[in-house]
From Swiss-Prot:
A Pfam short name: Adeno_E3B
Lumenal-side segments: 26-34
GO CC annotation: host cell endoplasmic reticulum; host cell membrane; membrane
Feature type site, description Cleavage: A22, A23
Recorded superkingdom: Viruses
Role noted for this protein: Prevents infected cell apoptosis induced by the host immune system. Acts by down-regulating a number of cell surface receptors in the tumor necrosis factor (TNF) receptor superfamily, namely FAS, TNFRSF10A/TRAIL receptor 1, and TNFRSF10B/TRAIL receptor 2. Down-regulation of these death receptors protects adenovirus-infected cells from apoptosis induced by the death receptor ligands Fas ligand and TRAIL. RID complex also down-regulates certain tyrosine kinase cell surface receptors, especially the epidermal growth factor receptor (EGFR).
Cytoplasmic compartment spans: 1-4, 61-91
Positions of the propeptide segment: 1-22
Presence of the UniProt keyword 4Fe-4S in the record: no
Keywords: Disulfide bond, Early protein, Host endoplasmic reticulum, Host membrane, Membrane, Transmembrane, Transmembrane helix
Descriptive protein name: Pre-early 3 receptor internalization and degradation alpha protein
PTM remark: The signal peptide is only cleaved partially by host signal peptidase. This results in two forms of the protein, one uncleaved with two transmembrane regions, and one cleaved with one transmembrane region.
C-alpha cells in the first residue's frame, strides 16, 4: 500500500497549483496597477514553482519507497523481520 502522506502531499501541491491558476485566469489586468500585476504574477510563479518542487519530491519519495520494498522482498524469508516490515509499511 502506498503511504498516505505521499498521496496527500501530491494532492495538496496539485490543488495549490490549480487553484492559483484558476484565480489568476479571472483577473482583469486593465483594472490593476502595473506593480500589483507584476507582484501578483510573481506570487503565482512562486506558488507554481513550489508546487512543482513538492510534486517532484513526492515522486522521488515514491520511487525510494518502491525500491526499498523490492529490496526487502528479495531477501530470503528467514531474514525478513516483521517489525522492520511494519516500520517501513511494506507488508
Amino acid at each position: 500500500m502506498i503511504p498516505r502522506v505521499l498521496i496527500l502531499l501530491t494532492l495538496v501541491a496539485l490543488f495549490c497549483a490549480c487553484s492559483t491558476l484558476a484565480a489568476v485566469a479571472h483577473i482583469e489586468v486593465d483594472c490593476i496597477p502595473p506593480f500589483t500585476v507584476y507582484l501578483l504574477y510573481g506570487f503565482v510563479t512562486l506558488i507554481l514553482i513550489c508546487s512543482l518542487v513538492t510534486v517532484v519530491i513526492a515522486f522521488i519519495q515514491f520511487i525510494d519507497w518502491v525500491c526499498v520494498r523490492i529490496a526487502y522482498l528479495r531477501h530470503h524469508p528467514q531474514y525478513r523481520d516483521r517489525t522492520i516490515a511494519d516500520l517501513l509499511r511494506i507488508l
